[in-house]
């Protein structure tokens, strides 16, 4: 039975990714014009901690947005319907971390390919 006196502080949907290296997260963000936009820095706390403590996790590959085409994802539904600010999709590459020489070449394009890859894998 649902206990209405409790809150959900964190939701993470975990996926494998077949087109990118590393471990990274997609999170939601309030529109800049919203009074709630001050929470956008809070949304990045967990990914920042993971970036500092987990070698395979790369903050540069993370993306924080509410995209129309992703409205049906668990992360966005829970963010909007249950107001779970810390609602994420964590992606982990099937291929491991980015090889050092590839990382050096990608520094300028900041892994632009991931913009279309959100929840690409396993029915995401």
Question: Where are these predicted regions, by residue range?
Answer:
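Structured catalytic-domain cores with a bias toward divalent-metal coordination
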Residues: 1-124
């Amino acid at each position: 039975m649902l206990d209405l006196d409790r809150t959900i502080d964190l939701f993470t949907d975990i996926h494998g990714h077949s087109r990118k290296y590393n471990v990274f997260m997609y999170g939601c963000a309030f529109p800049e014009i919203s009074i709630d936009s001050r929470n956008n820095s809070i949304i990045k706390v967990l990914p920042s901690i993971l970036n500092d403590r987990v070698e395979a996790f790369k903050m540069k590959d993370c993306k924080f947005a509410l995209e129309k085409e992703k409205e049906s994802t668990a992360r966005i539904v829970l963010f909007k319907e249950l107001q779970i600010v810390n609602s994420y999709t964590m992606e982990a590459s099937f291929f491991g971390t980015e090889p050092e020489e590839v990382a050096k070449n990608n520094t300028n394009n900041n892994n632009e390919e991931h913009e279309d890859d959100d929840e690409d894998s396993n029915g995401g």
